[in-house]
């Protein structure tokens, strides 16, 4: 529907008291992204031309998240919580600027797909003034009911105001609504609060539109997709649903997840073809994995880019700023951070590589540590192509080990090592023949 302008109004003013958290509800994360981020990303993918977000009083943290995701979004404050229609009207200035379609949704509904938003919006192009999204939950208790007559939506009745016959309806209100821009403001302004809670319900838009002789319809979505998150339990349930989606998409794209239920992905994780992910691997935000990569068990990746043919793990941790070029091997109990490791290099055991550049085909022996922090600042380590770092070596940054250089085992390197040189930085071994025998004899003499 690129020929029609779309104003999206996202309601993000809820207190979220059931979350029992100091963090605003909509800033809690699902698959590495805030719920608000998920919703805004879906609306962008659905063709939003303008975005308005309604936040609670003083919620600059929520406003900052909005602007980070959609820099040109308009942010409005709902000073009093008097119902959903009242919240939408907090964005009056955006509504007055006009749009062909207006889409209202909630920032605590992170699982809705762009395709479903398109389905909800479609009736407006066909002439409807209002379209509501419905679903059939396993238990409808607590939900508003969609009262229909044929293809028409007659009313949305909140459960507290529903008759016995209406409570028997299983088709429930998901909360998302689309309104024709030409009628949106007029309808919203006439919504009253004559109901059990004394609030201004957005759902009353249906009956007002029909009273004007306009059409209202209902679209249908899966229950999992429109699940709202109001508690930690529901947050975990949303995580499980989204993780399953992400795992299925990864496998459909050509990645092998040996035990999918033990692999946790972020919403932006990219896995190439013929990637093999063994059990118990966590992908934090910002991870891109090329083709033919093998990730062994118990690895944690975040903010890392892996080119084709890389092997990592088991028990590897890749932190933000890690770049592994093709064919790199990262072994067990290795941690990297802000490190670029070029093609064919190996860091196979028990090492920390931070704020570093490692050249192609270099080999870092077991226990190699880049000492990058002096308590005040971070410093870089440069390791040239083909360099060989002996086991249990400490490279005290800032320092450079040249191409093809060797560093002897157990070294503490504090000065640059030239290309093709050998650096030895440890005390010479001293052997005292018979010393141990004499020591034991002295210790075993009776005390007198």
Curated annotation (Swiss-Prot):
Is NAD found in the keyword set?
Answer: no
Which residues are noted in the entry as UDP-N-acetyl-alpha-D-glucosamine-binding? 11-14, 25, 78, 83-84, 144, 158, 173, 230, 319, 337, 352, 363
Q: Where does acetyl-CoA bind?
A: 366, 372-373, 409, 426
Keywords noted in UniProt:
Acyltransferase, Cell shape, Cell wall biogenesis/degradation, Cytoplasm, Magnesium, Metal-binding, Multifunctional enzyme, Nucleotidyltransferase, Peptidoglycan synthesis, Repeat, Transferase
Q: Name one GO molecular function term.
A: magnesium ion binding
- Which class of enzymes does this protein belong to? transferase
- Which residues does the Swiss-Prot or TrEMBL record annotate as the active site? 349
Q: In which pathway does it act?
A: Nucleotide-sugar biosynthesis; UDP-N-acetyl-alpha-D-glucosamine biosynthesis; N-acetyl-alpha-D-glucosamine 1-phosphate from alpha-D-glucosamine 6-phosphate (route II): step 2/2; Nucleotide-sugar biosynthesis; UDP-N-acetyl-alpha-D-glucosamine biosynthesis; UDP-N-acetyl-alpha-D-glucosamine from N-acetyl-alpha-D-glucosamine 1-phosphate: step 1/1; Bacterial outer membrane biogenesis; LPS lipid A biosynthesis
Concerning SUPFAM superfamilies, the annotation shows: Nucleotide-diphospho-sugar transferases, Trimeric LpxA-like enzymes
* GO BP term, pick one: lipid A biosynthetic process
Q: Where does Mg(2+) bind?
A: 108, 230
Catalytic reaction(s) noted: alpha-D-glucosamine 1-phosphate + acetyl-CoA = N-acetyl-alpha-D-glucosamine 1-phosphate + CoA + H(+); N-acetyl-alpha-D-glucosamine 1-phosphate + UTP + H(+) = UDP-N-acetyl-alpha-D-glucosamine + diphosphate
Q: Name one GO cellular component term.
A: cytoplasm
For this protein, the record's PROSITE patterns field holds: HEXAPEP_TRANSFERASES
- Coiled-coil spans are none
Name the EC number(s): 2.7.7.23, 2.3.1.157
Q: Could you describe the subunit structure of this protein?
A: Homotrimer.
- Entry-linked NCBIfam families: glmU, PRK14353.1
The Swiss-Prot or TrEMBL record describes its family as follows: In the N-terminal section; belongs to the N-acetylglucosamine-1-phosphate uridyltransferase family.
Q: What is this protein called?
A: Bifunctional protein GlmU
């Amino acid at each position: 529907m690129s020929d029609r302008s779309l104003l999206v109004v996202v309601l993000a003013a809820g207190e979220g008291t059931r979350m029992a958290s100091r963090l605003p509800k909509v800033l809690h994360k699902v698959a590495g992204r805030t719920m608000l981020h998920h919703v805004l990303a879906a609306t962008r993918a659905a063709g939003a031309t303008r975005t308005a977000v309604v936040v609670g009083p003083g919620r600059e943290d929520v406003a900052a998240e909005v602007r980070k995701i959609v820099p040109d979004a308009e942010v409005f404050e709902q000073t009093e919580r008097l119902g959903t229609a009242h919240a939408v009207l907090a964005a009056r200035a955006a509504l007055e600027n006009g749009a062909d379609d207006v889409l209202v949704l909630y920032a605590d509904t992170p699982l809705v797909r762009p395709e479903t938003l398109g389905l909800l919006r479609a009736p407006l192009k066909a002439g409807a003034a209002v379209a509501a999204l419905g679903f059939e939950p396993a238990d409808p208790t607590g939900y508003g009911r969609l009262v229909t007559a044929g293809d028409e939506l007659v009313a949305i009745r909140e459960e507290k105001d529903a008759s016995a016959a209406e409570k028997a309806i299983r088709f429930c209100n998901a909360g998302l609504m689309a309104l024709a821009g030409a009628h949106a403001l007029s309808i919203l302004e006439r919504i009253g609060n004559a109901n059990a809670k004394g609030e201004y319900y957005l759902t009353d838009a249906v009956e007002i539109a029909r009273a004007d002789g306009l059409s209202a319809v209902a679209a249908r979505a899966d229950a999992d997709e429109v699940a709202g998150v109001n508690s930690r339990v529901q947050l975990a349930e949303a995580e499980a649903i989204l993780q399953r989606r992400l795992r299925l998409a990864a496998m459909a794209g050509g990645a092998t997840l040996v035990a999918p239920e033990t692999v946790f992905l972020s919403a932006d994780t990219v896995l190439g073809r013929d990637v093999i992910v063994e059990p118990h691997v966590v992908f934090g935000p910002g991870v891109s994995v090329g083709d033919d990569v093998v990730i062994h068990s118990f690895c944690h990746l975040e903010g890392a880019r892996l080119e084709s043919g890389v092997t990592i793990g088991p028990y590897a941790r890749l932190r933000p700023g890690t770049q592994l070029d093709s064919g790199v091997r990262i072994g067990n109990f290795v941690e990297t951070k802000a490190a670029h490791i070029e093609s064919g290099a190996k860091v196979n055991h028990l090492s920390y590589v931070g704020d570093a550049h490692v050249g192609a085909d270099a080999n870092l022996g077991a226990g190699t540590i880049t000492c990058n922090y002096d308590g005040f600042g971070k410093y870089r380590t440069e390791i040239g192509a083909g360099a060989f770092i002996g086991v249990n070596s400490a490279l005290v940054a800032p320092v450079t080990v040249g191409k093809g250089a060797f560093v002897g085992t157990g070294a503490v390197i504090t000065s640059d090592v030239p290309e093709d040189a050998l650096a030895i930085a440890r005390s010479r071994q001293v052997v005292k023949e018979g010393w141990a025998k004499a020591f034991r004899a002295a210790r075993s003499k009776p005390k007198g």
